């Protein structure tokens, strides 16, 4: 898999500076769902950060955008990898009201925000490039979407 790359940003500087690069074992996630790509800024918890992101892989209905979750420590070491796509609701599946922005895209679930809300976690995301959604997951549901990377 591609390494986790951390960047440092200091206002009002608009340049992102490399802060570290960390290799990790994705246990075959990339081979099935594609490499992890962009997503929401990391959200802190008691001893690290959660990062909701996405990957893209070919499917019979077109390229499918899968939401995923990983966790890393403040020093950048990835401690938990996705054990599959993050199960976010999509009642529309591949149906759209408008023409596709990307003619090759099938189902698109694109995470854009992650925030703690009491004991739960709120995840904002886009569906098929035309709808926005909000899912609230409990801490156990979040933890079930990842597996610990052996030390």
Residue ranges and their predicted role:
Residues 1-34, 44-104, 120, 125-151:
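Beta-rich carbohydrate-recognition and catalytic domains
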Residues 38-41, 106-113:
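Beta-propeller and closely related beta-sheet repeat lectin domains
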Residues 76, 113-114:
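A short, hydrophobic secondary-structure junction motif
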């Amino acid at each position: 898999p591609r390494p986790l790359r951390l960047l440092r940003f200091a206002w009002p500087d608009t340049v992102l500076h490399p802060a570290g690069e960390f290799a990790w074992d994705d246990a075959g996630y990339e081979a099935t769902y594609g490499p992890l790509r962009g997503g929401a800024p990391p959200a802190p918890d008691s001893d690290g950060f959660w990062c909701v992101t996405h990957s893209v892989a070919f499917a019979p209905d077109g390229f499918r955008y899968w939401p995923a979750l990983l966790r890393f420590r403040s020093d950048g070491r990835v401690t938990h990898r996705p054990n599959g796509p993050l199960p976010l609701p999509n009642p529309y599946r591949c149906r759209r009201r408008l023409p596709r922005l990307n003619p090759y895209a099938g189902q698109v679930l694109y995470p854009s925000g992650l925030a703690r809300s009491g004991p739960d976690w709120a995840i904002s995301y886009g569906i098929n490039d035309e709808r926005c959604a909000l899912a609230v997951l409990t801490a156990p549901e979040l933890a079930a979407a990842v597996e610990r990377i052996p030390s």
